[in-house]
Regions:
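Negatively charged, low-complexity tracts enriched in Asp/Glu with abundant Ser/Thr
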Residues: 1-21
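Short aromatic-glycine-(Arg/Gly/Cys) micro-motifs in beta-strand/loop hairpins
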Residues: 22-52
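Mixed-charge, Lys/Arg-enriched low-complexity segments
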Residues: 47-101
């Protein structure tokens, strides 16, 4: 099983009726000061171009993995650990976005 602050990627297996344009999912572990990690499930229309459809915050990794399996049919064996370059690319995108809007 991945480490508690995992950064995981998987392609969607099942097209969602509610979000048919989503093709890939990233679960991005974020450290919280004086608390455990949280997990941002990021839905991508185009992962290579970082075209994000939306996201959802989970307090636990298991909860995020279960949601991805339920919504998109992603199995535990479908996930891969992201490379450091991928992590930095996503981290920069999160850090540079206007989260207060």
């Amino acid at each position: 099983m991945p480490k508690p602050t995992s950064h995981l990627f998987a392609y969607v297996r099942t097209v969602s009726d509610f979000r048919p344009d989503v093709t890939a999912i990233v679960i991005f572990g974020l450290e919280v000061t004086n608390d455990g990690p949280v997990y941002l499930l990021i839905r991508f229309e185009d992962y290579e171009e970082l075209q994000i459809e939306g996201d959802h915050l989970f307090l636990g990794l298991d909860e995020a993995l279960e949601s991805a399996e339920f919504e998109y049919g992603i199995l535990p064996s479908d996930w891969r650990v992201m490379t450091e370059a991928e992590i930095q690319r996503i981290d920069w995108n999160i850090s540079s976005s206007d989260l207060s809007a």
